[in-house]
Amino acid sequence: MRRNIKLIVFVSIIWMFVMVYYFQSSTEKVENRALRLREVATAMQQYQDDSSSAAAASTARQWAPAGGGAGPGAAAGAAGSGADDPGGNVILIGSVKDFERNAVHGLKLNGIVALEETSQGLSGGTGGPGGRLPVAPSGRGTEVEYFNEAGYIRAGALRNGEDPYIRNRFNQEASDALPSNRDIPDTRNPMCRTKKYREDLPETSVIITFHNEARSTLLRTIVSVLNRSPEHLIREIVLVDDYSDHPEDGLELAKIDKVRVIRNDKREGLVRSRVKGADAAVSSVLTFLDSHVECNEMWLEPLLERVREDPTRVVCPVIDVISMDNFQYIGASADLRGGFDWNLIFKWEYLSPSERAMRHNDPTTAIRTPMIAGGLFVIDKAYFNKLGKYDMKMDVWGGENLEISFRVWQCGGSLEIIPCSRVGHVFRKRHPYTFPGGSGNVFARNTRRAAEVWMDDYKQHYYNAVPLAKNIPFGNIDDRLALKEKLHCKPFKWYLENVYPDLQAPDPQEVGQFRQDSTECLDTMGHLIDGTVGIFPCHNTGGNQEWAFTKRGEIKHDDLCLTLVTFARGSQVVLKACDDSENQRWIMREGGLVRHYKINVCLDSRDQSQQGVSAQHCNSALGTQRWSFGKYA
C-alpha cells in the first residue's frame, strides 16, 4: 500500500512537470503572423460589411466552391477541393471589380490562384481593405493557414557537398538554418524607444527587387517587414523578380498576405526593375529595400514621419550589418553619413567632431547626408515621379545611388539618415551574378552618365581619378539633361558648397602625355605598383600613356606617382602609391628636361630596354632626356 502511494505521488509529480512544460511552451510560442495566408471568415465578413446587400448576395453566389460549376471556382478548375488543393481554399490576389466581372485570369500555385490587381479595381473603392478580396470561403470556418516555410526553403536548398558560398557569395547554409522570424537585437539608441510618432502616417508600398536571391534570405526580408511594421502602414509588398532562373522563387511568395509578384520577361537590372515596381505600386509613399535585409523594431514609423512632414525628403535607415558568414546581426554606428571620393565610389564617413557634439544631447535627430547607399530608402511617390524616377538607361547595378543623390539635392530635395530607423543588410565582398560586358564596364558606364549630367566641369576630377572611364561609351543623355533644365536644378558647384563642403576639389593638374622625339611616349608598360616605366610608340588614346602633372610636381598615372628610388645618379624610377614625399616631386625645365626638384638628375630613356626610364645627370644635349608634355595629338 505504501509503495502504491509513493508510485502515485511520483507519477503525479511527473505529470505536473509535463503540464507546466507544455503550458509554458504553448503560451510562449510567438505566432509568425507574416506567414499567414488569407483568413477565411474575417476577409469575407470585411467584404460583406462594406458592400450593399444586393452586391453581397451577388458576391456570395460568385464565391461558390471551386468546381461548383460557376464563377471563379469554375475558372480555376478543380482547385476547390481536389488533390491539387488539400486545404480546400482558393486564395485570390486581385481586384474586386475584376472578380465581380468574372475576369479571373490567374496563375494556379499549389491550389492558389494569384491575380494581379488592376488600377480600375483599386480605385473603385469597393471590396475589402485596399479593394482586395483576400480569401475565398470554404468549409473550414475561421482557421488560419500559414505559408509552408520549410517546404519553400527546402526547394531551394544546397545540394549535398555544394559550396554554401557559391550561389550568393554569402553562407546560404547559415541563412537556411535560421527561422524567418528570428530574434535580432534592438540596436537603436535608448532614446528612440521612448519617441512617439504622429498617428496620421501614410501607408507605404514596399518594393523589393531580386535576381536569384537565396529563398531563406528573401523570405526573411519579407517576414521582417510584415512582423516589425504596424499592419495598417504596409499596403503591399511588391516583389519584382528580375528574371530569376526559377520563377517559383517569387511566385510561391504570392501566397503570403499583402505580397504581389511581378516577373520580368528578361533581365532588366536594378534600376528598370525598381521603376516597374514603383509604377505598379498603389500607395502614395514608396519604400525601396534590397532582398537580403532584416528590418528592426519600429523601423518604419520614423521614416514615414519625415516624409509626411516634407514630401521632398528622401530618408534612409541606419544600415546595420548582417554577417555574410554566420548571419550575426551587428549594430552599426549612428554617427555615419554617406559620401564619396573623386573616383565616385560610395563610402561611409564619420560625422565631424563638431557635428557629433551637436548631436550629443539628442542622438535621435536626422542626419543630412550628401549621398545614400541606394539600397534602402523611402520617398514620396509623386516626388519620385516628378524627379524623373531613375535613369532608365543605366544597366544592371551601380551608380544609380550617385545619380539619384545628386538629383535630389540639386533639384530642391534633401537626403537624410534617420538614426531611430534600423535595417540590417547582408554585405558581400563580391557580386553573385554576372554583368553583361563585365561589372567594371557597367559601373563605369553608369557612373559616367551621372557625372556627365550632374557634375558640370567638375566631372574632369572624376576622369583624372579614373582615366580609363573615358574609354567606356555612356550612351545618349539628352533626356536627362532636359530633365535637369526642366526642374531648374542647381549646379554642382552649389552642391559642393552647400551639401558636401568636405569634398575638396583636387589641386589643378594638367592631363596629357610625355613625348620624346615626337613618336615615343612615356608608358607604364602595363606595370603597376613598384613597376618600372619605359617608352613606347605614341597611340594618342591615353591608357598606359596618360599622365597627370600636378601643381605639386607629381607625375601621376591613376593613383600611382613616378618615384625616385634613391637620391643618386642612375637611380631607377618606379611607380609607387602617391604619398606626397620628396621622391615624387619633379620640375619641367627649359629644353624639355624633367628634373627632380631636389637633386640634379633628370628622366632619361637611354637604358630603358634594360631597366626602364632612369634618373641620370641632367644634360639638355641628350635626346634621351628631352620631353614635351601636352594633350594628345
Swiss-Prot record:
<dbReference type="GO" id="GO:0030246">
    <property type="term" value="F:carbohydrate binding"/>
</dbReference>
<feature type="binding site">
    <location>
        <position position="425"/>
    </location>
    <ligand>
        <name>Mn(2+)</name>
    </ligand>
</feature>
<dbReference type="Pfam" id="PF00535">
    <property type="entry name" value="Glycos_transf_2"/>
</dbReference>
<keyword id="KW-0472">Membrane</keyword>
<dbReference type="GO" id="GO:0046872">
    <property type="term" value="F:metal ion binding"/>
</dbReference>
<feature type="binding site">
    <location>
        <position position="433"/>
    </location>
    <ligand>
        <name>substrate</name>
    </ligand>
</feature>
<comment type="similarity">
    <text>Belongs to the glycosyltransferase 2 family. GalNAc-T subfamily.</text>
</comment>
<feature type="disulfide bond">
    <location>
        <begin position="521"/>
        <end position="538"/>
    </location>
</feature>
<feature type="binding site">
    <location>
        <position position="290"/>
    </location>
    <ligand>
        <name>Mn(2+)</name>
    </ligand>
</feature>
<dbReference type="InterPro" id="IPR029044">
    <property type="entry name" value="Nucleotide-diphossugar_trans"/>
</dbReference>
<dbReference type="InterPro" id="IPR001173">
    <property type="entry name" value="Glyco_trans_2-like"/>
</dbReference>
<feature type="binding site">
    <location>
        <position position="431"/>
    </location>
    <ligand>
        <name>substrate</name>
    </ligand>
</feature>
<dbReference type="Pfam" id="PF00652">
    <property type="entry name" value="Ricin_B_lectin"/>
</dbReference>
<dbReference type="GO" id="GO:0005795">
    <property type="term" value="C:Golgi stack"/>
</dbReference>
<feature type="topological domain" description="Cytoplasmic">
    <location>
        <begin position="1"/>
        <end position="4"/>
    </location>
</feature>
<dbReference type="GO" id="GO:0006493">
    <property type="term" value="P:protein O-linked glycosylation"/>
</dbReference>
<dbReference type="InterPro" id="IPR045885">
    <property type="entry name" value="GalNAc-T"/>
</dbReference>
<feature type="binding site">
    <location>
        <position position="291"/>
    </location>
    <ligand>
        <name>substrate</name>
    </ligand>
</feature>
<dbReference type="GO" id="GO:0005794">
    <property type="term" value="C:Golgi apparatus"/>
</dbReference>
<keyword id="KW-0479">Metal-binding</keyword>
<keyword id="KW-0328">Glycosyltransferase</keyword>
<protein>
    <recommendedName>
        <fullName>Polypeptide N-acetylgalactosaminyltransferase 2</fullName>
        <ecNumber>2.4.1.41</ecNumber>
    </recommendedName>
</protein>
<feature type="topological domain" description="Lumenal">
    <location>
        <begin position="26"/>
        <end position="633"/>
    </location>
</feature>
<feature type="binding site">
    <location>
        <position position="267"/>
    </location>
    <ligand>
        <name>substrate</name>
    </ligand>
</feature>
<keyword id="KW-0333">Golgi apparatus</keyword>
<keyword id="KW-0430">Lectin</keyword>
<feature type="binding site">
    <location>
        <position position="242"/>
    </location>
    <ligand>
        <name>substrate</name>
    </ligand>
</feature>
<keyword id="KW-0808">Transferase</keyword>
<keyword id="KW-1133">Transmembrane helix</keyword>
<feature type="region of interest" description="Catalytic subdomain A">
    <location>
        <begin position="201"/>
        <end position="306"/>
    </location>
</feature>
<dbReference type="GO" id="GO:0000139">
    <property type="term" value="C:Golgi membrane"/>
</dbReference>
<comment type="function">
    <text>Catalyzes the initial reaction in O-linked oligosaccharide biosynthesis, the transfer of an N-acetyl-D-galactosamine residue to a serine or threonine residue on the protein receptor. It can both act as a peptide transferase that transfers GalNAc onto unmodified peptide substrates, and as a glycopeptide transferase that requires the prior addition of a GalNAc on a peptide before adding additional GalNAc moieties. Prefers the monoglycosylated Muc5AC-3 as substrate. O-glycosylation modification of proteins by this enzyme might be important for cytokinesis.</text>
</comment>
<feature type="disulfide bond">
    <location>
        <begin position="561"/>
        <end position="578"/>
    </location>
</feature>
<keyword id="KW-0735">Signal-anchor</keyword>
<feature type="binding site">
    <location>
        <position position="397"/>
    </location>
    <ligand>
        <name>substrate</name>
    </ligand>
</feature>
<feature type="transmembrane region" description="Helical; Signal-anchor for type II membrane protein">
    <location>
        <begin position="5"/>
        <end position="25"/>
    </location>
</feature>
<feature type="binding site">
    <location>
        <position position="428"/>
    </location>
    <ligand>
        <name>substrate</name>
    </ligand>
</feature>
<dbReference type="InterPro" id="IPR000772">
    <property type="entry name" value="Ricin_B_lectin"/>
</dbReference>
<feature type="domain" description="Ricin B-type lectin">
    <location>
        <begin position="508"/>
        <end position="630"/>
    </location>
</feature>
<keyword id="KW-0464">Manganese</keyword>
<keyword id="KW-0812">Transmembrane</keyword>
<comment type="pathway">
    <text>Protein modification; protein glycosylation.</text>
</comment>
